[in-house]
Amino acid sequence: MEFVVKSAKASTQKTATLILPLGENCQLGSVAQSVDSASAGALSTALKRGDIQGKPGQTLLLHGLPGLKAERVLLVGTGKADELDSRQWRKVVNAALAVIKNLGGGDAAFAMQDVQVKGRDSYARTRLLVEIVADGQYVFDQFKSKKAEPRALQKIILLCDKAEQAGVERAAREASAIATGMAFTRDLGNLPPNVCHPTFLADQARQLSKAYKGVKLDVLDEKKLRELGAGAFLAVSQGSDQPGCIIVLQYNGGKKGDKPYALVGKGITFDTGGISLKPGLGMDEMKYDMGGGASVLGTLKAVLELQLPINLVCLLACAENMPSGGATRPGDIVTTMSGQTVEILNTDAEGRLVLCDTLTYAERFEPRAVVDVATLTGACIVALGSNTSGLLGNNDELIQQLLQAGESAADRAWQLPLFDEYQEQLDSPFADIANIGGPKAGTITAACFLSRFTKKYPWAHLDIAGTAWTSGGKEKGATGRPVPLLTQYLLDRING
């Protein structure tokens, strides 16, 4: 998908479809009024028929209006001006996209420059529009014998005021990169687990390191992990015939000597629960348990597309959690890379086991801050549903940076407490720590566990169990979240 920014008049723009906003009660904005004048009042005449009222997401497609170079005009309702927020804006853009992607002509022009979205300037409004349109074109049909028909829509023209053109161009460029990262994340998540295993993810990382400059790859195999004393990680991977690994990607786009930011992703490519076996219903969706690792790779891809001037290290904790004669048992005690011992009471609480050793390994990079991303707990879905990611950590400034990034990127998170009182739930009579803390506050106690291994740097934990994929039905599939949040967080570190 190509995005082109122009400061041309809407009435003189040659395009297959010109998209114009329509406010509540058929209110035409300044741009739409100029188009109405150029077409000898054709818009006003069409509105008198009462086919559209301007409510959010309503559409009316008009053909062959006089005086215009556009073949069609699509009116899209934006509702009441004082109620148009990011959520409504998404509804508006998706409504337009639903129409234009089924039309011929190959292009469409958005003339939305006079629309005001609460809390968003022209840059932020445009960036969200481009992300929605690009992500809305996503198709996953790699394993279909009959592929989807090629999309007719190939180019989007973004009309803007001359004074805002530079900002809109930057928005389109950044949004396109984020959408590319989201698509990569979605592809990895949607792949079947017999294809996407730890070695496959390492191969994907290798291809990424070869495709872009400034990237260094290191894959820590199980032999190396044994040498490092990664007993918690190996306790998870030992039940599978697929060997586990920690994938380390270093991108040095910033100044030499600047400490890097670090992203750590949970990459459990299939989670049966191990000996603590999950129920069979819905287990197929446990291929998405590598959503944290996939989103870290997707974020890195967005960073590489933009060649951001930042130093970044990405670590993926990749393993399968399978039952077998060699699998870890409930009650086993292992020694982590940090030297702390863990009593494994439930083998289905495996994500924190691979993450704790990976978080310890991250210390050697002396990071400015570490953000780990994981489909960690079902409890987070109970608490926050599928709209919002859970956020916890040991540094208030970092937490606020991530919350703000989520708001800016329309990919929101919500902070949960990490009070010391919760730590007591992880007490074990036989080891330093247990890997579960009972039925209460599951998301919090999982983060409490990770906090034991993150004392040497500012750290935050994103629980994306509810946001990484859409469960069941025709819309089932990976979402690409939280690539927008993470990319925005890194952009803010540069711009800040």
UniProtKB/Swiss-Prot annotation:
Q: Where does Mn(2+) 1 bind?
A: D271, D348, E350
Assigned GO CC terms: cytoplasm
Q: Where is the active site?
A: K278, R352
Cellular location(s): Cytoplasm
Which keywords does the record carry? Aminopeptidase, Cytoplasm, Hydrolase, Manganese, Metal-binding, Protease
- Report the GO molecular function annotations: manganese ion binding; metalloaminopeptidase activity
Cofactor(s) for this UniProt protein: Mn(2+)
InterPro entries the UniProt entry points to: Leucine_aapep/pepB, Macro_dom-like, Peptidase_M17_C, Peptidase_M17_leu_NH2_pept, Peptidase_M17_N
The UniProt function text for this chain reads:
Presumably involved in the processing and regular turnover of intracellular proteins. Catalyzes the removal of unsubstituted N-terminal amino acids from various peptides.
- Put simply, this protein is called Probable cytosol aminopeptidase
